[in-house]
Amino acid sequence: MNKFSSVWVFSDTPSRLPELMSGAQAVGEKVNAFVLNEADSATACHLGADHVWLLSGKPEDRMIEDYAAAMAETIRQHSEGGAVLLPNTRRGKLLAAKLGYRLSAAVSNDASDVSLQDGKAAVKHMVYGGLAIGAETIASPFAVITLSSGTFDAQQPDASRSGEMHTVQWQAPATAVTRTATQARQSNSVDLDKARLVVSVGRGIGSKENISLAEALCQTIGAELACSRPVAENEKWMEHERYVGISNLMLKPELYLAVGISGQIQHMVGANGAQTIFAINKDKNAPIFQYADFGIVGDALKILPALTAALAR
């Protein structure tokens, strides 16, 4: 497989770093990682970074993405081309845009596949709501790419690995957003990417209060709770970070238990990587049953308590 001579990685979300590092090693010869603190420096080395660049000196009232100027200058000084891999988080995409401008590079978001073909970056991602795969070839020397969750398997750390350490000093941008206050968001977010068992609820659960039935099942079998996009975005019953689908989480658990989820393609793109899909839906014609390995047609409000009781024995 052809590889980029140099790949640069940064993740604003620590849980996404192992996957990004795995991707960087799969497509790059030399792996560089930008990090925000000393602890992340060691982690990046153990995950396979050849060079670790510690971002330092940012004032407390400035945003992480304001490191873009210093990052771009570092990338230009130490490579003539290559790929920059970021998570497809909100901050990841904002930083991608800033780096793309400063590196005169094309930016591709939500990539599900990255490779080097004929000396150019080849990127694939979902289009038309998950109904098709779009393929792009990036002609610019640098390619800035945000990766969808689950594109690569997470890299396992190796404490025996080491890399060369560097420091990148803060450069104040000409214009910047200044943070005037910070308020912690109330969230019970969990790293669903690593969950072995996932119970996911859709609007078929009926109400926010009924989600407690799925939570009880999760506690019984040691699963994590997820949801469909309408539950998070429309009904506001659960956090945005928990919804599965093309524009958010792409999961690959051993078991995905879909409760009251119709099974539209936009959702299933994020769930179809599961080893086993189990569906509960009162509509026997729901699309979810076309994807499910096992299914029950019936009222989830009756089935969930019975299933929880049976599995608790």
From Swiss-Prot:
The keyword Electron transport applies. The keyword Transport applies. SMART domains: ETF. PROSITE patterns: ETF_ALPHA (PS00696). Keywords: Electron transport, FAD, Flavoprotein, Transport. GO terms for biological process: carnitine metabolic process; fatty acid beta-oxidation using acyl-CoA dehydrogenase. Transmembrane segments: none annotated. One of its GO terms (molecular function) is flavin adenine dinucleotide binding. Pathway: Amine and polyamine metabolism; carnitine metabolism. FAD binds at residues 255-283. NCBIfam families: PRK03363.1. Belongs to the ETF alpha-subunit/FixB family. Heterodimer of FixA and FixB. Required for anaerobic carnitine reduction. May bring reductant to CaiA. This is Protein FixB.
